[in-house]
């Protein structure tokens, strides 16, 4: 893989990690487009590190607060919200890895993501702010995040949808969703590093790794800041239409043996 391909995959990872359209699903499509095999695992890991950097930079005040106040309500909310994904991830890791490699369900998963995004806008706008979020809210939002273990189910999409259903206001829904992404991304990085050290990754040039990581970080930061502002006044339906179109296209190509 050359640095330009890594740069493009970094753009895909950075934008789609925080837009509600599934980063894993788009990375699968990107690897297919560039004819990369699963040996791109090490690059995937570095791309996740890039998006993690984006979150750390955007939420630097929050993370400084969490370090100084490790037993704060915010920390407990993040822990409670992360539990469902940890349980599902540990119990079914191998099963979902096999699904991710084949891509056989990706088209359907994009359609499911679109359904939830479309239905979310039918809810009346909530008024809950960060201080109003309960542990029950965090657990339910985290349970929706656990569904994103399927490769083309959007993590940010599902958590934003769940947050809106729990009556968080639109800005807070996106804000908490991205903050909750941090432990999920860290967990994904840890699991991928385990596979890397077990020899499941190919050798990739340091230039490509650096370019891909910085690209993911830069575009991830843009996506976080843009999405929080966008959701204040705009609908999620445009993302629903996009993933529906993509899902239908993928299913059509799969059924005609083109993909």
Curated annotation (Swiss-Prot):
InterPro entries for this protein: UppP
Gene Ontology MF, one: undecaprenyl-diphosphatase activity
Disulfide bridge positions per record: none
Gene Ontology CC terms: plasma membrane
Membrane-topology descriptor: Multi-pass membrane protein
Keyword Cell membrane belongs to the record: yes
Annotated catalysed reactions: di-trans,octa-cis-undecaprenyl diphosphate + H2O = di-trans,octa-cis-undecaprenyl phosphate + phosphate + H(+)
Membrane-spanning parts: 1-21, 39-59, 71-91, 99-119, 133-153, 174-194, 208-228, 239-259
Keyword Membrane: yes
Its EC number(s): 3.6.1.27
Subcellular location: Cell membrane
One biological process term in Gene Ontology: cell wall organization
Record Pfam families: BacA
Keywords: Antibiotic resistance, Cell membrane, Cell shape, Cell wall biogenesis/degradation, Hydrolase, Membrane, Peptidoglycan synthesis, Transmembrane, Transmembrane helix
Function, as annotated: Catalyzes the dephosphorylation of undecaprenyl diphosphate (UPP). Confers resistance to bacitracin.
Similarity remark: Belongs to the UppP family.
Miscellaneous information on this protein: Bacitracin is thought to be involved in the inhibition of peptidoglycan synthesis by sequestering undecaprenyl diphosphate, thereby reducing the pool of lipid carrier available.
Protein name: Undecaprenyl-diphosphatase 4
């Amino acid at each position: 893989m050359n640095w330009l391909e890594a740069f493009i995959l970094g753009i895909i990872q950075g934008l789609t990690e925080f837009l509600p359209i599934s980063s894993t699903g788009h990375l699968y499509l990107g690897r297919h487009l560039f004819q990369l095999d699963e040996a791109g695992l090490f690059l995937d890991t570095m791309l996740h590190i890039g998006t993690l950097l984006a979150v750390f930079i955007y939420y630097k005040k929050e993370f400084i607060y969490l370090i100084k106040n490790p037993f704060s309500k915010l920390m407990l909310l993040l822990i409670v919200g992360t539990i469902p994904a940890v349980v599902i991830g540990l119990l079914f890791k191998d099963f979902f890895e096999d699904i991710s490699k084949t891509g056989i369900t990706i088209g359907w998963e994009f359609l499911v993501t679109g359904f939830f995004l479309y239905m979310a806008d039918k809810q009346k706008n909530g008024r809950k702010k960060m201080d109003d979020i309960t542990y029950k809210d965090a657990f339910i939002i985290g349970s929706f995040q656990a569904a994103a273990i399927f490769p083309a189910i959007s993590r940010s999409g599902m958590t934003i949808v769940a947050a809106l259903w729990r009556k968080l206001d639109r800005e807070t829904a996106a804000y908490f969703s991205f903050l909750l992404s941090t432990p999920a991304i860290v967990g994904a990085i840890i699991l991928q590093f385990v596979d890397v050290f077990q020899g499941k990754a190919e050798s990739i040039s340091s230039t490509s790794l650096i370019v891909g990581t910085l690209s993911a970080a830069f575009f991830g930061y843009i996506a976080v800041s843009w999405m929080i502002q966008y959701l204040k006044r705009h609908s999620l339906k445009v993302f629903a239409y996009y993933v529906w179109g993509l899902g239908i296209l993928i299913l059509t190509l799969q059924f005609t043996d083109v993909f």
